[in-house]
Amino acid sequence: METLLDLLPRVERLGSREALRFWNGYRTWRWSYADLDAGIRRFVAFLDRKGVASGDRLVLWSENRPEWVAIFWACLARGVQVVPLDHQSSADFVSRIVDQTGARLLVHGGAASPVSGAECFAIESLNGLTIGPRFRPTPVSGSDVVQIMYTSGTTAEPKGVIHLHRNICTNLDPILEEIDRYKK
């Protein structure tokens, strides 16, 4: 596997099988791979309309939820670098990260207050977007950036750590080999 995009065809192929399960404290939400595919296509179309393209950065500041996963994969499909932040981060910290990274778009959860410096999008709005057509992922290589993860800043100011497709795929390859082995 060269890039994480090599996994996208599996999403289409698995259709109605369960992809994600999320408990929000009151009920369990389930997303099939078809739901995930629709979410990815919705956000890819949104990125295309906004002109957010390969090499741009997007800050993803939200609690864990299925839409987070769809938005992450949509960004990968367009070569957009994701900067995921803990949903409990302060608006001041998020604003500094938006400035440091030059993010074009900030996706935030409902409890988070939008910050200046980037266009804001509420993650809960994903399902209200129009599902885009099938798309061809933007070509990427193993040396392209997937995400910039910020350290906790325990001993100093938090720093952005770059994760490449190659780094993540190196960790995933043995796992996928085992999964494929047991499918037989």
What spans do the regions from the language model cover?
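A short N-terminal helical cap/helix-turn-helix that marks the beginning
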Residues: M1-L20, A38
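Conserved pre-ATP/AMP-binding loop-to-beta segment of ANL
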Residues: S16-E18, P133-Y150, E157, D180-K184
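ANL superfamily adenylate-forming
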Residues: G25, H108-S143, T155-P158, C169
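Conserved AMP-binding A3 loop
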Residues: R30-A34, V146-D173
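Structural detector for helix-capping/boundary residues
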Residues: A34, K50, D56, R104, ...
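A short helix-loop-beta submotif of the ANL/AMP-binding
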Residues: R57, E63-V83, H87-A91, Q100-R104, ...
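Conserved ATP-dependent adenylate/AMP-binding module captured primarily in the ANL superfamily
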Residues: H87-V115, T130-G132, N171-K184
